[in-house]
Amino acid sequence: DLGAVIYLLLWGRQLFALYSSNDVTDISDDRFPKPPEIANGYVEHLFRYQRKNYYRLRTEGDGVYTLNDKKQWINKAVGDKLPECEAVCGKPKNPANPVQRILGGHLDAKGSFPWQAKMVSRHNLTTGATLINEQWLLTTAKNLFLSHSENATAKDSAPTLTLYVGKKQLVEIEKVVLHPNYHQVDIGLIKLKQKVLVNERVMPICLPSKNYAEVGRVGYVSGWGQSNNFKLTDHLKYVMLPVADQDQCIRHYEGSTVPEKKTPKSPVGVQPILNEHTFCAGMSKYQEDTCYGDAGSAFAVHDLEEDTWYAAGILSFDKSCAVAEYGVYVKVTSIHVWVQKTIAEN
């Protein structure tokens, strides 16, 4: 006695099931024939969960479920617990090419940075944000308070921001969460109202479990910031930059001035946040840095062994294009625990 039979059809990307009894005459649709029996054997009814492109199955089992005598679908390893599909991170279809340079030292990003988001304030100021999973993005705390008073709260900020992912795909913001020490750690999180569909144009970047911000390591920073003629760019671009020596970066900002802005001492008239939670990238005589509008973008590092892209940092400070040679980034390893905790609690 074979018991009840579940006939399955994978139609497009949806899984459909038809229920029937043992009697093959009960099957009215010949697209679902009853499996033929064999001598000295039996038919085992099972199905397998598959993942869509740009997702992976998260399960301790193999995704295969069989029908037991209690008419329950059971996996040998996890029982009736179902697998989950989670988005792939850090696997762009068209990774950055370090050879194809364009005017101004920046590079044209053709789907190379699918984690890059564009955020626009209520006064039309453009900044960056970085997708880290299907529903959350990292950006700077300063970005979240653009055009707001000192007394503004995170709740005040969220409704005034417009956010785009991929190619101008508008997404709605549910809430923003500031780092508890955002005056020293210039970071905030954005939660979307709905999860985004991950594809070749929209994909999160991975968060690292180790420090990739080693002096001399080259990373890639993308954004819609100003070019070196101080015009906002229409297309996403990127630049390659090495991690700089922190002490040299600190001396640069402490000892440099411009004639019209001598206080505080800094090449751009304001002092960046430099502490154990930050690192610098760029070179002292290099004119191909990121520019105003890129804050919130990731310092993306390619791990060649894993063939995976990680966010080593989030750009916090770089407002001058050709004046300040170093950009300042918040280390993602410094905020990783807070990020995971905040996402879990929200």
Swiss-Prot record:
Domain of life: Eukaryota
Residue span, Sushi domain: 32-85
InterPro entries for the chain: Haptoglobin, Peptidase_S1_PA, Peptidase_S1_PA_chymotrypsin, Peptidase_S1A, Trypsin_dom
Cited PROSITE patterns: TRYPSIN_DOM
Residue ranges occupied by any Peptidase S1 domain in the UniProt entry: 102-344
GO terms assigned for molecular function: hemoglobin binding; serine-type endopeptidase activity
Main location: secreted
Alphabetized Pfam families for the sequence: Trypsin (PF00089)
Disulfide bonds: 249-280, 291-321
Signal peptide: 1-16
One GO-annotated biological process of the protein: zymogen activation
Gene3D superfamilies the record matches: Complement Module, domain 1 (2.10.70.10), Trypsin-like serine proteases (2.40.10.10)
Keywords of this entry: Disulfide bond, Hemoglobin-binding, Secreted, Serine protease homolog, Signal, Sushi
Function recorded in the entry: Primate-specific plasma protein associated with apolipoprotein L-I (apoL-I)-containing high-density lipoprotein (HDL). Binds hemoglobin with high affinity and may contribute to the clearance of cell-free hemoglobin to allow hepatic recycling of heme iron.
Entry text on domains: The uncleaved signal sequence interacts with HDL fluid lipids and mediates incorporation into the HDL particle.
Family, as annotated: Belongs to the peptidase S1 family.
Family matches, as PANTHER family: COMPLEMENT COMPONENT 1, S SUBCOMPONENT-RELATED, HAPTOGLOBIN-RELATED PROTEIN
Name of protein: Haptoglobin-related protein
Organism: Pan troglodytes
